[in-house]
């Protein structure tokens, strides 16, 4: 019974994260090493679960160990320079065959639908094709890379059509040129460019390591870009982990909101990273100097630090962490150097075409610099997107600030009926409204 209760508790706490990811696009790199992990079948089951939750998946497949084996079987040596495999003409066939075998293995696993397994009735559709246009690396520092190449572009329109038709898209590490040539690409480059050009919500890279560790061998659950730069400069990472971190860093600096490094050996690592507060690996985020954006589930901790002092003073109505998580899609935030310095929420009443402006808060050290104004404009823009005509608010302490920005005092009777029923007469808040 205790296990069942633990499961129910976990499922309840994960629901805000599930809602936050529904409809989002994730690019996930599965390296060749993952295919040989005892945990590989669990990864397949977790991908099927993500698909069933309405998450759009673009999978990128690597094949480094399989290529090494294929070359070894022919007693051919392989040369790696600056993280790229040199691919002479006589080795290209080995690369193609090894990559194709891995692709077929992945497609077969995703097609499985045996009863009494997690894949029962999954009905996954996996599409792959010539969606990666490539060009040769050429000769760099005197080294001829042969048929090794780099991503020129991703066929965004074709991939979007497949995703909209509920297909999972599979991109191998092979690219094709307009002249009909095949190029061996670095899988991390394919994943990074796919995430950037598709404007994906996340880039996720599986590695053997659980993530990035500090000098005390403790896992970083989150890294800002400048911290990642420092770690890369130290030169202490394995080549595979270094490739992964460089790819994640490039993605977030190109406006992919977040990137993640997780272990392909950890059972449930992907689900834990996406659907729990603690996660399982390392998340990499950009050092945004300051930006206004929609809140995400990862912002809840920072928002609580911002809101709790105001709640303690009675300025704001108290909200639990669970409530914030469940209502996270209502919030916008201002983020500065990775910290949440301001937030506000919009609660729409669609029938009355009105919206409540609530939970407006700016960190004390950042007040007086028009951040409240930016929040208000952001909420007004969001209200117009939702075809609302009016926004209203209840306040006990900040009436003049809103009056100066076009709000007018109104009566309780002017509020939507549901809001009237929730009015707290003990707080005796004043009511203000503004036509949009």
What are these model-predicted stretches?
Residues 1-58:
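N-terminal glycine-/serine-/threonine-rich phosphate-binding loop
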Residues 40-43, 88-118, 156-157, 163, ...:
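Polyanion-binding loop/helix "lid" in catalytic or ligand-binding cores
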Residues 72-170:
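Ligand-binding beta-strand-loop-alpha-helix segment within the catalytic cores
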Residues 287-317, 428-431:
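Short amphipathic alpha-helix that is part of the acyltransferase structural core
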Residues 317-363:
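A conserved beta-strand-loop-helix scaffold within acyl/acetyltransferase catalytic domains
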Residues 362, 368-385, 393:
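Conserved acetyl-CoA-binding loop-helix of GNAT-fold acetyltransferases
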Residues 391-403, 408, 413-419:
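Conserved beta-strand-loop-alpha-helix junction that forms the acyl-donor binding cleft
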Residues 415-436:
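C-terminal "cap" of GNAT-fold acetyltransferases
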């Amino acid at each position: 019974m205790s296990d069942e209760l633990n499961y129910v508790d976990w499922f309840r706490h994960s629901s805000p994260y599930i809602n936050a990811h529904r409809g989002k696009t994730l690019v996930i790199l599965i390296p060749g090493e993952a295919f040989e992990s005892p945990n590989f079948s669990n990864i397949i089951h977790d991908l099927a679960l993500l698909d069933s939750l309405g998450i759009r998946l673009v999978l990128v497949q690597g094949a480094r160990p399989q290529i090494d084996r294929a070359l070894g079987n022919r007693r051919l040596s392989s040369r790696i320079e600056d993280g790229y495999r040199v691919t002479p003409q006589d080795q290209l066939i080995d690369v193609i065959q090894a990559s194709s075998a891995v692709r077929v293995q992945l497609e077969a696993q995703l097609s499985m639908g045996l009863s009494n397994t997690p894949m029962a009735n999954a009905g996954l559709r996996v599409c792959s094709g010539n969606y990666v246009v490539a060009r040769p690396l050429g000769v760099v520092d005197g080294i001829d890379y042969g048929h090794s190449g780099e991503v020129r572009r991703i066929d965004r329109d074709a991939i979007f059509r497949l995703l909209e038709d509920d297909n999972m898209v599979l991109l191998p590490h092979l690219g094709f040129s307009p002249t009909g040539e095949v190029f061996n690409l670095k899988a991390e480059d394919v994943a990074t460019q796919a995430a950037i050009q598709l404007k994906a919500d996340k880039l996720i890279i599986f590695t053997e390591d659980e993530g990035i560790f500090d000098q005390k061998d403790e896992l970083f659950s989150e890294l800002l870009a400048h911290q990642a730069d420092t770690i890369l400069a130290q030169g202490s990472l394995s080549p595979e982990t270094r490739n992964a971190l460089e790819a994640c860093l490039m993605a977030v600096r190109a406006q992919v909101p977040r990137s993640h490094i997780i272990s392909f050996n950890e059972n449930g690592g992907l689900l834990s990273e996406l659907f729990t507060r603690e996660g399982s690996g390392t998340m990499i985020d950009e050092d945004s100097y300051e930006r206004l954006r929609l809140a995400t589930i990862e912002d809840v901790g920072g928002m609580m630090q911002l809101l709790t002092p105001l709640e303690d003073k009675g300025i704001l109505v108290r909200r639990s962490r669970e409530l914030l998580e469940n209502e996270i899609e209502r919030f916008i935030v201002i983020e500065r150097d990775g910290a949440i310095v301001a937030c506000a929420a919009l609660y729409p009443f669609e029938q009355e075409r009105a919206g409540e402006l609530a939970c407006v808060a700016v960190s004390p050290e950042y007040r007086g610099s028009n951040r409240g104004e930016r929040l208000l404009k952001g909420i007004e823009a969001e209200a117009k997107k939702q075809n609302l005509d009016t926004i209203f608010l209840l306040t006990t302490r900040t009436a003049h600030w809103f009056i100066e920005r076009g709000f007018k005092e109104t009566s309780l009777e002017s509020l939507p009926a549901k809001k009237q029923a929730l009015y707290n007469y003990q707080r005796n808040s004043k009511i203000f409204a503004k036509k949009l």
